[in-house]
């Protein structure tokens, strides 16, 4: 479906801008009018990570006049495998500041606005209100639903992308013309069911593939050219090198954009998405130990069985001495319980403590009352006990 241009054109392009954007200007569908609209556009990128990196770089190169960056994190060495807007010299720096420097290095004519804060229900409306279009580069469900609901309530379009291992998805959500994210995914998955990129990994170059698609869609919406991905979900399988599309219809019963919406103001999205389930939270109360406590138990020869509930490829990267591997899903399916000793105390751990808390809830309900898990997981262990080991 063709849509009208989102923004009005700027008054003019300078001589330098004409020279810079000449390859756009000779495209009939873009031309002077389209480039002036890009110059006048205000686009906010939520996140300067895997998707935000290529998105910001190409938005800047394309000549978007104002770019906002929402990012509160710092550059970590593990980011550099895919977050190409940052460099080795940026490790430890603010991601927002690092991204700004890269953007201005690409295009000094861009006005960059930094929002160095976590995007939350109490600031999202004020931040989003300053921009014409949002590019969602987030990697967690709570923020995705927050972005969606804020955009629906403000009647703003946004370009969404998602990546995991070798798979990517992208769409344009604009409730005035089509469905929103909740029409596609009315409810978040159960806590721990879908691994994050930090848990499951992602092919670095996949970020460029999906991020570039997001920028393409942003340009189309801003300039009013082509047929944006409104009402369509694009799915990319990098292993098979296949693209396919699925039609997404507006849900008349959608909680936020439907005929009788029940979400008319922003909610508690962490609670809505159940970042850690109530069962896991209850199980962890009084049954969480620190890496230092575990080290003391090991040194004292305590009668314990340390179980790593991560995936085999994670176990190969780094592990706690003496831990044996039983992936989380084997507990969720019930097949692992029969392998647990009845005469030893079970100590669970994962990468950070989220998955092990979910497994702890399963063990508690199965009668392993003295089972515990390690808060902070193997990452906490490395930081506190064996700093010479790698983290991921």
Model-inferred region functions:
Residues 1-44, 77-78, 266-268, 272-282:
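N-terminal charged helix/coil linker that caps or initiates catalytic domains
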Residues 2-6, 108-121, 125-213, 223-225, ...:
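E1/E1-like adenylate-forming module used to activate ubiquitin-like modifiers
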Residues 3-8, 238-252, 256-304, 312-347, ...:
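Rhodanese-like catalytic fold shared by cysteine-dependent sulfurtransferases
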Residues 4-12, 69-107:
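Glycine-rich phosphate-binding loop and adjoining beta1-alpha1-beta2 segment
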Residues 38, 127-132, 340-341:
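A short, aliphatic-rich alpha-helical micro-motif
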Residues 46-47, 70, 349:
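Conserved N-terminal Rossmann-fold NAD(P)-binding element of oxidoreductases
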Residues 51-52, 355:
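Hydrophobic/small residue at the entry helix of a nucleotide-binding pocket
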Residues 61-66, 366-369:
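Conserved S-adenosyl-L-methionine
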């Amino acid at each position: 479906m063709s849509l009208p241009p989102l923004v009005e054109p700027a008054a003019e392009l300078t001589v330098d801008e004409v020279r810079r954007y000449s390859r756009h200007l000779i495209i009939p569908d873009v031309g002077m009018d389209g480039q002036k609209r890009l110059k006048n556009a205000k686009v906010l990128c939520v996140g300067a990570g895997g998707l935000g990196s290529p998105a910001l770089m190409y938005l800047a190169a394309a000549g978007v006049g104002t770019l906002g960056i929402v990012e509160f994190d710092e550059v970590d060495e593990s980011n550099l495998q895919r977050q190409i807007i940052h460099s080795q010299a940026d490790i430890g720096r603010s991601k927002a500041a690092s991204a700004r420097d890269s953007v201005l290095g690409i295009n000094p004519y861009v006005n960059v606005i930094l929002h160095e804060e976590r995007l939350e229900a109490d600031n999202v409306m004020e931040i989003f209100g300053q921009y014409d279009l949002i590019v969602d580069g987030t990697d967690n469900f709570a923020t995705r639903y927050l972005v969606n609901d804020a955009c629906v309530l403000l009647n703003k379009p946004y370009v969404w992308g998602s990546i995991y291992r070798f798979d990517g998805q992208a769409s344009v959500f604009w409730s005035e013309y089509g469905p929103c994210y909740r029409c596609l995914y009315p409810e978040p998955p159960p806590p721990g069911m879908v691994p994050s990129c930090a848990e499951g990994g992602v092919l670095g170059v996949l970020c460029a593939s999906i991020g570039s698609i997001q920028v393409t869609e942003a340009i189309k919406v801003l300039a009013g050219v082509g047929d944006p991905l409104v009402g369509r979900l694009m799915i990319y399988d990098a292993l098979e090198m296949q693209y396919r599309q699925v039609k997404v219809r507006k849900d008349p019963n959608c909680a936020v954009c439907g005929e009788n919406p029940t979400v008319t103001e922003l909610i508690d999205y962490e609670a809505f998405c159940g970042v850690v389930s109530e069962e896991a939270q209850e199980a962890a109360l009084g049954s969480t130990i620190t890496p230092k406590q575990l080290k003391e138990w090991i040194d004292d020869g305590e009668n314990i069985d340390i179980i790593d509930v991560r995936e085999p490829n994670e176990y190969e990267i780094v592990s706690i001495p003496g831990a044996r591997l039983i992936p989380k899903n084997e507990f969720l399916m019930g097949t692992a319980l029969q392998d647990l000793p009845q005469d030893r105390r079970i100590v669970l751990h994962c990468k950070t403590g989220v998955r092990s808390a979910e497994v702890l809830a399963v063990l508690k309900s199965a009668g392993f009352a003295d089972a515990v898990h390690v808060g902070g997981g193997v990452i906490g262990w490395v930081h506190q006990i064996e700093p010479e080991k790698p983290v991921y």
